[in-house]
Amino acid sequence: MKLVKNENNKKPESVSDEEAREAFIKILRWIGEDPTREGLLETPKRVTKAFKEYFKGYQEDPKEILSKTFGDVEGYSDMVVQKNISVQSHCEHHMAPIIGIAHVAYIPNERVVGLSKIARVVEGFSKRLQTQERLTVQIANTLMESLDAKGVAVTIDSTHQCMTMRGIKKEQATTVTNFYLGQFKDDLSLSLIHI
């Protein structure tokens, strides 16, 4: 699996699909299963394929997604809000799923981005091992910098399986994070808008 550089600008050591499958075979043995039984013969291959999908964000550059913008919007300069963007991620501590929604708003500075691009940025950062706090900040910072926006606001509301299926087991617990930049942070009336 080919990976992009991490935040420390270091490229992780590459691991082949075969090495990943071998690791999953060991995990099956570790939990007490027989990886040679009929129902599990293809499991290491399937899990390797699933992990490629779960963590495809390591192969994407969200800033590149935002490289094409549009200026012909007839002077539109007010807030653009995209709500209920699906978030499917995994916590970096237990690799347990994080399922939720993101609401993203930005105030353009003469140029706007295609609406699907906002959702793609959310997905690009979501498809990595994450903390919700970092995910919220990464989305906001990337939009602010790439679009030269006047302001960005990001809210994520999600359920963490590491809290619902293990440990404290609080099935109804959700986590909400907010991050404001530019005019959203500076203008109290804008920061009170619950996107």
Protein language model regions, located:
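Short, low-complexity, polybasic intrinsically disordered segments
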Residues: 162-191
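Conserved small/polar residues in nucleotide/adenosyl-binding loops
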Residues: 193-195
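Active-site loop/lid in soluble adenylation, ligation, and acyl-transfer enzymes
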Residues: 2-98, 183-185
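Beta-rich nucleic-acid/ligand-interaction surfaces
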Residues: 44-50, 157-165
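Beta-strand elements of well-folded, non-transmembrane domains
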Residues: 89, 108, 158-160
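Structural motif
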Residues: 77-80, 103, 151-153
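Well-ordered alpha/beta subsegment
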Residues: 123-159
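Histidine-centered catalytic/metal-coordination loop motif
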Residues: 92-137
